[in-house]
Design a protein with these regions (language model features):
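Conserved alpha-helix/loop element of class I SAM-dependent methyltransferases that forms part
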Residues: 29-45
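Conserved SAM-binding loop and adjacent beta-strand
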Residues: 19-32
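S-adenosylmethionine/decaboxylated-SAM
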Residues: 4-22, 40-223
Length: 223
């Protein structure tokens, strides 16, 4: 389905092919969806992940692009602000700082990619992307957005907008709880909101590729 700012809504993604996985838990769902999205990348360009954490999905991406440099962006200090998932809770499901790595854990992440063509870029996205853009010309062919928050997602899409071109494949990790395998009442205030604002502000068009039975979905940019 072709999506633009006029017809954007969560119903648009219901037409995407569902990637079924016998194991209904989150991690196998994510990996299966990610592998299918990676198979759709035909464009030559930068391969980027935002939200590395322990490096598990970055490893999947670098396995696929074994002869290509892969960029992994993360503050490694955890969420910059609380991530509220449920409207009925007294506090955030994930407070600011959640997903931070201790020094030993960060060393493990660095070491696991030491012999791979992976460049880790530490820092908050609104700063690290600006610095990265100055030194790295060229378009983005694949983008994995796994940063949970509206604020982080809109920073990524806005700052990389000129590098996101027809053929760019983008995977979103927390778009919508399709089968309610994990409660996410406030999905409209997360990645979904950022994508809607991005396509309307910059007059972008995309087609849906896949969605998982969890929260993931993928798109290919047309305009």
């Amino acid at each position: 389905m072709i999506i633009d700012g006029k017809n954007f809504g969560i119903d648009c993604f219901h037409s995407a092919r569902i990637i079924n996985c016998k194991n209904k838990s989150k991690r196998p769902q994510r990996y299966s969806h990610l592998a299918h999205a990676l198979s759709k990348v035909k464009l030559t360009g930068h391969v980027m992940e935002f939200g590395v954490w322990q490096g598990k999905t970055l490893k999947v991406i670098s396995d696929h692009f074994s002869n290509h440099t892969v960029w992994g962006f993360d503050s490694f200090e955890g969420l910059p602000e609380p991530w509220f998932m449920m409207s009925s809770q007294s506090g955030p499901r994930h407070p600011a700082g959640k997903f931070a790595l201790a020094k030993e854990e960060l060393s493990d992440v660095v070491n696991q990619f030491a012999k791979r063509k992976v460049n880790l870029v530490p820092g908050w996205f609104n700063q690290s992307i600006v610095s990265w853009l100055k030194d790295n010309p060229g378009v983005v062919s694949f983008l994995h957005i796994d940063c949970d928050l509206y604020s982080s997602t809109i920073d990524i899409l806005t700052l990389l907008n000129s590098r996101i071109v027809p053929g760019t494949v983008i995977v979103f990790d927390e778009m919508y709880p399709w089968n309610n395998l994990e409660r996410y009442d406030l999905w409209e205030q997360g990645e979904f909101q950022a994508v809607g604002e991005w396509i309307r502000t910059h007059q972008r068009t995309f087609r849906t590729l896949y969605r998982s039975e969890h929260q993931q979905c993928s798109i290919e940019v047309i305009v």
